[in-house]
Amino acid sequence: MPTDITRRTLLTTAGALALLPAPARSAPLVLTPGQTEGPFYPVALPADADSDLVRVQGAAARALGIVTHVGGRVLDRHGRPVPGAAVEIWQCDAQGIYRHPRAPDQQRFDAGFQGYGRTAVDAGGGYAFRTIRPVPYPGRTPHIHVAVIVPGTGRFVTQMYVEGEPLNARDGLLNSIRDPAARRSVIVPLRPSPAEPGALGGTFDIVLDL
């Protein structure tokens, strides 16, 4: 559960994203490509399932890893915010372990890391999470699973990748996206974040075929 400090940080991040100008209507938007959900979506959602994955209610310490702020906007194909949408993310911990009963080495999962979070978009379509920088594990480049739930439309699933990762060139799922522009749209640069000392930040806008 977020502390007052992290609540302020998340609100600041979300507010900054909401103030970004919407894409010009005449500019062609690249639809975010769908990707597989993967085998480790939570069987049961954690009791603490907010947008701050770095702090778990009752845990003695925060999550291992580099704190990373990930946010953006959920837009339709015309660049308009999608009202009422919710965004979920889930990922492995800093050791490459998922919070899931079938995940390898489950007994070593970092108790200070939520592993899953959910948030509603704001009026501008903005969302924000405080998580950790994704790490590789055997067979996969660093990535974060992302799902968008739109009332009356259904659930859209994709994955976010990190720019500059050497394993990107060999990742089968990333390279299954054949269109270069679509593939680039899910690769996000992570840079020092002004929201928190020592943290990284990246923007991942999600464009739905609506």
Where are these regions (language model features)?
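N-terminal secretory signal peptides and thylakoid transit peptides that target proteins
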Residues: 1-18
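Beta-strand-dominated extracellular/periplasmic modules and repeats
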Residues: 27-187, 191-210
